[in-house]
Amino acid sequence: MIYDVAVIGAGQAGLAMGFYLKQKRLSFVILDKGSKIGESWKERYDSLKLFTPRSYSSLPGLSLEGEQNIYPTKNEISDYLIGYTNTFSLPIQLNTTITKLAKVDERFILSTNQGEYQSKNVVVATGPFQQPNIPDFSKHLSGEVLQLHSSEYKNSRQLIKGTTVIVGGGNSGAQIAVELSHESEVFLSVGHRLTFLPQDIGNKSIFCWFDKLGIYKANVNSKVGQFIKNRPDPIFGFELKSQLKNRSVILKSRVVSADEKNLFFDDGSSVVVSNVIWSTGFKSDYRWIDIPSVVDEKGALNHQRGVTPVKGLYFLGLPWQSSRGSALLQGVGTDAEYIFKQL
């Protein structure tokens, strides 16, 4: 069978794409390497809560149930994605890993561990969270030091007794630092000045105000969009700020090297560590795409709002694909609708 559209990835981006594809009489399939819908959310750390409230944490066509000003947990989102799939009867093939994507004439050939698929169009919705981005010098740490990427961290029971350094100043690193500060000596290493924003202003989520002010939907090419994009993300909430003030979490500068049980920082200081949590984000890996002009020599994608120079090939779920909201649950629906209209 030759599908009209093959979607690669059944996370929030792929499911949002599926919602719109259901609006047309198109044959399509959503392929995902996972064994369950919502699996990647379930695997995140136990205490994870979104920094967007329920009112800004749903996909097109189905609201996230519950008090709309409350911040949902990771398990709520996982369950929501399962319900979303069932509500719209989306055709998903799980346990399917794409090993190669090629184009022959006017058809795309998707080679997978489950056999070959063919499609007239392909939407790559694997998102940005593909491979943990851990610096090479981490290999210089002793095997006695426990190292975890933030995607592997679940709770404090995984850690060994002693000092913990969390590397990375995003919201995940901030949440983990606050959580661990109640149990052990914690250092937080960041390469930029931290900025903090309240989660709520006047009993409304700050994202409600972002929306009203045009910040949430600021186009990536606008002056506002470029200003926000080129600055580190703020930390939402003031828990970490309080912990830094009372020294429950000790702030360190950027980690530059490691040796045995020591981490070295760019201010010349060092810390003897027992645990390191690399909250350093992810990097993309598109080596499986065997189509010229899509990925450059540095691994960057060639696209405009997810539309590539290759007819019929699209991307979805990228940070700043069109706006600040592109990386968020609610925002991905806007990008999915745009791609849908290009088909």
Region spans (language model):
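Flavin (primarily FAD) cofactor-binding/catalytic cores of flavoenzymes
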Residues: 1-34, 38-40, 69-171, 175-343
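A structural motif shared across PLP-dependent enzymes of the aminotransferase-like
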Residues: 46-50
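Glycine-rich flavin
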Residues: 53-68, 219
